[in-house]
Amino acid sequence: MEIFPAIDLKEGRCVRLYQGEFSKETVMNEDPVAQAIIFETFGAKRLHIVDLDGAVAGESLNLSVIERICKAVRIPVQVGGGIRSLVSVEKLFSVGVDKVILGTAALYDKPFLEETVRLYKEKIIVGIDAKNGFVATRGWLDVSEISYIDLAKQMEKIGVQTIVFTDISKDGTLAGPNVEQLELLQKNVATRLIASGGIASIQDVKKLNDMNIYGVIIGKALYEKTIDLEEVLEVTKLC
């Protein structure tokens, strides 16, 4: 299982939100580059970064910070948030990003998604963020009428190989992942799944590992030390 420490960027800082609410942010580190180095130092093999400002604006607004992170660490970095054009995708790859996560564009711009998957194949990940089972977009501010299962099926048909699934109600809560929704996803698609939202303990990670979930994104639990990064990396290596 892959472990992805999370860095959420807002106004150039590393923050955490509660249930996706921008009004409920906590600054975890004023220096995201330093935070990335900390994660790498403690053994992280890859990083998950979200440009929260970009997710709302529809374009990358923390590109310079992302570039500095990519230059500061030697591990692969995947980035999502506001990536809705081929130019944005190419810019991220040009500054050293390993994989790009598309969210809103996956729902509303299928030709763009199909083109990027054709060009970059496994380098393109789709992020599906769900609120009460329906896909939320544009920084989680809009909730669509399409279910997360239906969108996942569409993504698989297009050729998407990896999906990041987030239950927004769990995000930043340390309440545990939404195992039921993840199990339903597994029954409906064969894509690799990365679970995000609510991960609070080593036991949560072990549960997802037992389900053969490909990867887990861990944010708040690392910052609040309910999960030790070195320990969780060792545990998943032994499983």
Curated annotation (Swiss-Prot):
Keywords: Amino-acid biosynthesis, Cytoplasm, Histidine biosynthesis, Isomerase. One of its GO terms (biological process) is L-tryptophan biosynthetic process. SUPFAM superfamilies: Ribulose-phoshate binding barrel. GO terms for molecular function: 1-(5-phosphoribosyl)-5-[(5-phosphoribosylamino)methylideneamino]imidazole-4-carboxamide isomerase activity. Its main location: cytoplasm. InterPro entries: Aldolase_TIM, His_biosynth, HisA_bact_arch, Isoase_HisA-like, Isoase_HisA-like_bact, RibuloseP-bd_barrel. Pathway: Amino-acid biosynthesis; L-histidine biosynthesis; L-histidine from 5-phospho-alpha-D-ribose 1-diphosphate: step 4/9. Its EC number is 5.3.1.16. The active site is at residues 8, 129. It is found in: Cytoplasm. One of its GO terms (cellular component) is cytoplasm. It catalyses: 1-(5-phospho-beta-D-ribosyl)-5-[(5-phospho-beta-D-ribosylamino)methylideneamino]imidazole-4-carboxamide = 5-[(5-phospho-1-deoxy-D-ribulos-1-ylimino)methylamino]-1-(5-phospho-beta-D-ribosyl)imidazole-4-carboxamide. It comes from the Bacteria. Pfam families: His_biosynth. The keyword Cytoplasm applies. Belongs to the HisA/HisF family. This is 1-(5-phosphoribosyl)-5-[(5-phosphoribosylamino)methylideneamino] imidazole-4-carboxamide isomerase. The gene is hisA.
